[in-house]
Every structure is written in C-alpha cells, then in structure tokens.
C-alpha cells in the first residue's frame, strides 16, 4: 500500500489543527478579559433567572430524537439507491427490499412497543 498519496491529507489535517489552535490561543491571550460581578451574573432577558437553567427533560424527548436520527439515516439510503437503480440491477433491488423489510419490521416493533406514543 502506497501511503505517499495520503501525505496531502495529513498535511491538511496538521495545518488545519495547528491554525485552529493558534487562532484560539491568540484570541485568549490578546483578547480583553475584565470579569466583574455584573458580567458573571446570571442573565435572562433583562431579568434575574426565574429557575435553574438545568431543567430535566423527559426521556421521551431523547427517545424521539434517537428514533428520528435512525429513521432519517435509513431514509437517506433510499436516495442514492434510487439514482443508481439501473446500474445495480436485480441484486441491488433485492438487497434494498431486504433493507426496507428490516426498516418496516423495526418500525412495526417500535410502534407495537409504544415508542411512538407520547403518553
């Protein structure tokens, strides 16, 4: 395996990381930093904070977010498949039908377990 082809990528990563660290460091060193009690006070729309900013969220929010990401990712696989359907032929069609069957089985399982019910 010829690793010389990856040297530009490595150089790009090193320069990008170094430049990012350098710019953040320069901003921290040269930027004005004069904290006082007013600047460190909690602020919420011109008023003192009414309650703790760290409210607990219901676990269902996270469940809905995870389910959305999973199903959105599965749906994203449909677009390249639709574009390349003529080139991949029957094997690609059968593979995608198996994928969609697994997708529908997962959707039915989540629906049956109540993952889509809010109450």
From Swiss-Prot:
Enzyme Commission identifier(s): 7.1.1.-
Pfam families reported for this sequence: Oxidored_q4 (PF00507)
GO function terms (MF aspect): NADH dehydrogenase (ubiquinone) activity; NADH:ubiquinone reductase (non-electrogenic) activity; quinone binding
SS bonds (residue pairs): none
Keyword Cell inner membrane attached: yes
Localization per record: Cell inner membrane
GO CC terms: NADH dehydrogenase complex; plasma membrane
Signal peptide: none
Keywords, comma-separated and alphabetical: Cell inner membrane, Cell membrane, Membrane, NAD, Quinone, Translocase, Transmembrane, Transmembrane helix, Transport, Ubiquinone
Reactions that this protein is recorded to catalyse: a quinone + NADH + 5 H(+)(in) = a quinol + NAD(+) + 4 H(+)(out)
Superkingdom per UniProt: Bacteria
TM stretches of this protein: 7-27, 63-83, 88-108
Ribosomal protein found in the keyword field: no
HAMAP family: NDH1_NuoA (MF_01394)
Assembly: NDH-1 is composed of 14 different subunits. Subunits NuoA, H, J, K, L, M, N constitute the membrane sector of the complex.
Listed name of the protein: NADH-quinone oxidoreductase subunit A
Higher taxonomy: Bacteria, Pseudomonadati, Pseudomonadota, Betaproteobacteria, Burkholderiales
Name of the coding gene: nuoA
